[in-house]
A protein has these predicted regions:
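N-terminal Rossmann NAD(P)H-binding glycine-rich loop of SDR-like oxidoreductase domains
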Residues: 2-32
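A hydrophobic C-terminal alpha-helical subdomain
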Residues: 5, 237-289
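NAD(P)H-binding glycine-rich loop region in Rossmannoid oxidoreductase-like domains
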Residues: 13, 43-101, 105-108, 121-123
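Non-catalytic, hydrophobic alpha-helical segments
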Residues: 21, 76, 190, 194, ...
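Glycine-/Pro-rich loop/turn segments that contact NAD(P) or position catalytic residues
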Residues: 82, 86-168
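Glycine/proline-rich active-site loop of Rossmann-fold NAD(P)-dependent oxidoreductases
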Residues: 158-165, 196-205, 228-230
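Substrate-positioning beta->alpha
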Residues: 176-197, 203
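Substrate-binding strand-loop-helix patch
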Residues: 181-188, 207-225, 238-244, 278
Length: 289
């Protein structure tokens, strides 16, 4: 269907170009020859220069700064979202409303397609603050009338640094028996699939890295990266539940949002279709040196 519509001459707007994933997507789109318009809060934070790359400053939380930003654009890609709430902004302010601002502007300018980066299993995790905003945005995008693709990645390699931080001390702590599995993905591999989504007709894509690993196996990789003896401490789940109750009761959503997400996904299988060729073991070894 899309072969006759999409080409490297298409104009792509990327929102969130200076984030971890956004940098890899920018590089991939430029490499593929697309005419790329990268939207950033601060131009100084993006170093890539290319003839087919234009850098624009805008505040996606302020719709007045987005006026005409989608003019002559064919596809919008948004990685906009926050892990930790800051600047007084909530998940609803950023993950939801900022992307609504982009969708509305894109629709007004006749953009053909909107690609949104969400999170794996977000549909099952709507009760979590982070996922509530992302899923509400997904619902809004689906009802917008625009062609769309929602990409749901597993955790990034960079999210696995908690394992490394523990391994550096000589012990890794896990909730439960450590047998639950996940396949985190490198930003470079995910960027490749995001670029592919421009030209296919998939509406939703679940995606993870090439290696499906148990939490025990990830802990072992982290300990080996630091050449430490394998020492994994398995904590009973009541400790996790108590900690989760405590942060929800005694801290603000600003503080507990990322903690409740981490603690909830730690007791879930987070398995996604395998993609890419970057290995978590290599990432850990590089980080540990």
């Amino acid at each position: 269907m899309y072969g006759s519509i999409w080409s490297s001459k298409n104009k792509i707007l990327l929102a969130g170009a200076t984030g971890y994933l956004g940098r890899f997507i920018t590089e991939k789109l430029v490499e593929k020859g697309y005419d790329v318009r990268a939207v950033v809060r601060n131009k100084d934070k993006i170093n890539l220069k290319a003839q087919n790359l234009t850098i624009l400053e805008a505040q996606v939380t302020q719709p007045e700064t987005l006026k005409n930003i989608c003019e002559n654009i064919d596809v919008v890609i948004s990685t906009i979202g926050i892990t930790r709430q800051k600047d007084g902004l909530t998940y609803m302010d950023v993950d939801f409303q900022s992307n609504v601002n982009l969708i509305d502007e894109a629709k007004k300018e006749g953009v053909k397609k909107f690609i949104y980066i969400s999170v794996l299993n977000g549909e099952k995790l709507r009760h979590l603050k982070i996922c509530e905003a992302k899923e509400k945005l997904g619902d809004y995008l689906k009802s917008s009338g625009m062609d769309y693709c929602i990409i749901r990645p597993n955790g990034f390699f960079s999210d696995m640094k908690d394992f490394l931080n523990m391994a550096k001390t000589g012990k890794v702590y896990l909730f439960g028996d450590g047998k639950l599995k996940l396949n985190p993905i490198h930003g470079k591999d995910l960027a490749k699939e995001v670029a592919n989504a421009i030209r296919n007709d998939k509406k939703e894509i679940n995606i993870g890295g090439p290696d499906l690993l148990s939490q025990n196996e990830i802990a072992e990789l982290a300990l080996r990266a630091y050449k430490k003896p394998i020492k994994i401490i398995h904590l009973p789940d009541w400790i996790r539940k108590l900690a989760l109750w405590s942060v929800r009761t005694f801290t603000s959503a600003k503080t507990y949002g990322p903690i409740e997400f981490f603690m909830t996904t730690m007791v879930m299988d987070m398995e996604a279709p395998q993609f890419g060729n970057h290995k978590l073991e290599d990432f850990f070894n590089d980080e540990a040196t």
